[in-house]
Regions:
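Polytopic transmembrane helical bundles with strong interfacial aromatic enrichment
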Residues: 1-136
Length: 136
């Protein structure tokens, strides 16, 4: 039962990150003027990062009894999301507010890279459920 809960938490993490990062921003910019879409995203991202931290931490705890590697990977996602939310996101917002496009581009690129790595790691953890440790 714990493995099923761990799988669901990890799938929620993976799907939520993909949907939010690949879908929400594109959708908002397609239906709203850019300044309004940017404001909406600015309000959404703190919640997104809390979702990532919570679902990754839950997955880490739930999978730990059966797979310490997956647990460590999910814990790493949760832990590395903290500075992304608390340091990088405010720096991106400050660059936007200052009109510093170069700094925004660098910082936003870093946040995208972090999210891509998180998605790939969560995907790897999901794949590990198909071949559990010690399995054939």
């Amino acid at each position: 039962m714990m493995q099923a809960a761990a799988l669901l938490a990890t799938a929620l993490l993976f799907g939520g990150m993909v949907l939010f990062s690949a879908g929400l921003a594109a959708f908002l910019f397609s239906v709203m003027p850019p300044p309004e879409a940017g404001k909406a995203l600015r309000k959404a991202f703190p919640h997104f990062y809390l979702f990532v931290m919570g679902s990754a931490a839950a997955g880490a705890v739930l999978v730990a009894p059966g797979d310490v590697v997956s647990s460590a990977l999910l814990a790493a996602i949760a832990l590395t999301t903290v500075p992304t939310r608390q340091v990088l996101m405010p720096a991106i917002n400050a660059a936007t507010d200052a009109g510093d496009r170069r700094r925004f581009g660098l910082l936003h690129g870093a946040s995208v890279a972090i999210t891509v790595v998180h998605v790939l790691v969560a995907g790897y953890v999901l794949a590990r459920f198909l071949a559990p440790p010690g399995g054939a």
